[in-house]
Design a protein with these regions (language model features):
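N-terminal binding-site loop/beta-alpha segment at the start of enzyme catalytic domains
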Residues: 1-73, 130, 136
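A general structural detector for well-ordered alpha-helical segments in enzyme core domains, enriched
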Residues: 2, 31-36, 58-65, 91-95, ...
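Conserved, mostly hydrophobic/aromatic
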Residues: 6, 18, 47, 62, ...
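Active-site mouth loops of central-metabolism enzymes
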Residues: 19-30, 77-87, 115-120, 211-217
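Structured C-terminal cap/extension of enzyme domains
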Residues: 30, 38-41, 45, 164, ...
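Short catalytic-loop micro-motif centered on adjacent basic/acidic residues
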Residues: 45-52, 77-79, 141-146, 172-173, ...
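Structural motif corresponding to the early beta-alpha repeats
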Residues: 53, 68-89, 110-113
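Glycine/proline-rich, positively charged
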Residues: 83-188, 194-201
Length: 298
């Protein structure tokens, strides 16, 4: 397994992160728990989750999977949807209970996708106040944010953070071979994160499978491309053992790509990427869980 440094935190984490959303998919919870155990046995230390995934089932399954001393072997991340101080504090406490832990290593502001989301994060009685109190209490260690819609909203978040003299520890965003051509987080946000020492967490390397439907790239090419960027972690969902095997193989076979190799890969995807067809999470609303469940934010 490859290991990388998580931005300015100095934490060493696996370059492949186990996505939490897909752990809620197997009908039998034991299958999901087996995936968690196998991932740890094979060197994955970064665990991804979110308060809202599958009605909390993803966190509950991961919590069971991290019993018997395994929690101490991983770097645990989850996310929250609250847009107020009270809802954020409540969701942190619920995640701690489900994950069966006394602290979360990294917690992230989920779905920074609307133009007002950055302002709400820094507002009076907003999420940041709850996060700072939770950090002081030892419930969380690091703070980040995520989003999949438009790089402009991430840039706005970074600008507001600078105005408030606040440093984010991480930022999670789509990084894939299609993103390079359309509303590109890689072009517009990634350089700012690297410059500021904010850990880059790549997600949707295969665009929830949509990138593969283009027929232009293979799963390994998708993962290798994301690993070749200055990412600390590439998070990938694994609802079956075969998909975990694929992620492990990508880490095992990864070698830094030459500029010519990157250019050739992007050339294969350019025409397919230009309309956003294979990144529907940027153009459609069905991927915006907080928009579909506004009560989560209150």
């Amino acid at each position: 397994m490859l290991y990388r440094t998580l931005g300015k935190t100095g934490e060493k984490v696996s370059a492949i992160g186990l996505g939490g959303y897909h752990l809620g998919h197997p009908p039998d919870p034991a299958d999901a728990i087996q995936i968690v155990h196998s991932a740890i046995d094979r060197g994955i230390t970064f665990m991804d989750n979110s308060w809202d995934y599958n009605g909390g089932e993803s966190e509950r399954r991961m919590g069971v999977g991290l019993r018997d001393g395994l929690r101490q072997k991983v770097f645990l991340m989850t996310k929250f949807d609250g847009r107020t101080k009270d809802s954020t504090a409540r969701q942190i406490n619920e995640s701690l209970q489900r994950l069966q832990t006394d602290h979360i290593d990294l917690i992230q502001y989920h779905e920074n996708i609307r133009l007002e989301d950055p302002d709400r994060f820094f507002a009076v009685d907003g999420p940041l106040e709850a996060l700072l109190e939770a950090k002081k209490a030892g419930k969380i260690r690091y703070i980040g944010f995520t989003g999949h819609k438009d790089p402009f909203v991430h840039v706005r978040m970074l600008e507001l953070a600078a105005q408030h003299n606040f440093h984010f520890d991480s930022c999670q965003m789509p990084l894939n071979v299609m993103d390079a051509h359309f509303r590109s987080f890689g072009h517009d946000v990634l350089p700012r994160l690297v410059e500021q020492g904010i850990a880059v967490l790549g997600m949707k390397s295969m665009g929830d499978g949509n990138v593969l439907e283009s027929g232009r790239v293979t799963p390994l090419e998708c993962l290798h491309y994301a690993l070749n960027l200055p990412t600390s972690v590439v998070i990938t969902g694994c609802e079956r053992m075969a998909i975990l095997d694929q992620a492990i193989e990508a880490a095992r076979t990864f070698k830094p790509m030459s500029s010519a190799e990157v250019s050739a890969l992007l050339a294969k995807t350019k025409d397919a990427a230009m309309t956003g067809q294979f990144e529907p999470f940027k153009t459609a609303t069905q991927f915006d869980s907080t928009a579909q469940n506004p009560n989560w934010m209150r």
